[in-house]
Amino acid sequence: MRTKRRSISWRIAVVVGTGVVLALPARASAQANCSSESLALQVLGSGGPSAGGTRASTAYLIWRGGRAVVMVDAGGGTFLRFGEAGAKLQDLSLLAVSHLHPDHVSDLPALLWLSELSRQQRLKVAGPSGGGTFPSFDVFLGRLFDAGSGAFPMLGGTLGQSGQGVRLDVVVVDAAAATAQGVLSDTDLEVSAIGVPHGDVPSIAYRIEVDGRSIVFGSDQTGGDPRFSTFASGADVLVMHLGLSEQAAGPVMQLHARPATVGRLAQNARAKRLVLSHFMKAPPTVTTPGWFSLFDLDHTVAEVKKSFSGPIITAADLQCIPIP
C-alpha cells in the first residue's frame, strides 16, 4: 500500500485463533479524501439508523482517477460527508440506492438541491422495485419531487418537470428477480444488482466492476439467500453491514445478519478483503443493548473473523481504502 504524506489512522482487525493482530491503514479525518488514488472505496457514513456518536448513516463512494464516479446510498449526514470528501456531483456516473429505509436515502433531496447549477448531463440513479408497503424507486422519487404533488415540488426538474434539479435517468432494479441485472455499462465500468433478503423491504446488493477490479456492496440483509455469495464471488472488496451481535434474537433477525453469517457469506464468496460497516447501537428504550454491534464492536468483529479467514477493515466515516 502506497505511503501518502497525509495523516493516517490505523484501524485494527483482530485475527482470531492465530494470535496475529492485523493493522490496516485508513484515513479518517475531515481532510482525508481519495482524490489522489487511482481506484479507491471511500466510506462516507459507517453508521445505521440510531442517532448519537460521530457516524453518519450509510453511504459510500467509488473513486477512479481522482473523481468520485459511483455513490451507493445517501443516508442521513452523508450530504455533509460528500462535501468533506471533496466529491463533486458532476463527476458521478451513478447514484445507487440499496433500499428505501431513511438511513440509506434521506439525504438524497439535499444532494439534488441546486444540482442543476453544477451538472448539465442527466444523472443515472438506481433503486429497488416495490413490495408490500414500499413503493418502487420511481414512484418514491415522484412522491419526493413531483412538481404538483411532491414533498419537494421545487425539485420537479429532476423528473423533467418544471422546477430545479438535474434531470434523473431512473433505473428500477427488480428485487425479486432470480438473476443479477445490469444497471450501468460504460467504459471499464460495469454495475450489476441483485435482490437480498431484508424482511419485507425490497433491498438491493450492487457489484461494481471497474478497471479489472470488483467492489460489492451487500446492503442490509439477513444472509439467507445463497445466491448472494455467488453474486459477490471473488470480490476485491466486499462491504457488509454489521448491525447486530452474535447474541441478537427476535424481530431484528428478520432484517439483519449475525456476525457469524456475515463472515460465512464473505468466506463463501472468497472475498479478498471484507469491509464491515453500518454499525448500530441500541435505541434508548431497548432492554437488550448487547444485541447491537456498537455495544462491543471489537468483540463483534472478532466473531466475524471466526468464519472469515481474510483481512477485515472496520469502517469509519471518510475512510479511504485504496484498491491496488
Where are each of the predicted segments found?
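Binuclear metal-dependent hydrolase catalytic cores
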Residues: R2, A30-I215, V301-I323
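Bacterial N-terminal signal peptides that target proteins for export
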Residues: R2-V14
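N-terminal twin-arginine translocation
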Residues: K4-S7, V21-S29
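Short N-terminal micro-motifs specific to bacterial/archaeal maturation
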Residues: I8, A51, H99-P102, M253, ...
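Bacterial N-terminal signal peptides
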Residues: A13-A23
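Residue-level recognition of conserved structural "scaffold" positions that shape functional pockets
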Residues: L24-A28, G52, P226
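Cap/insert and terminal regions of metallo-dependent hydrolase folds
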Residues: A205, S214, Q221-Q319
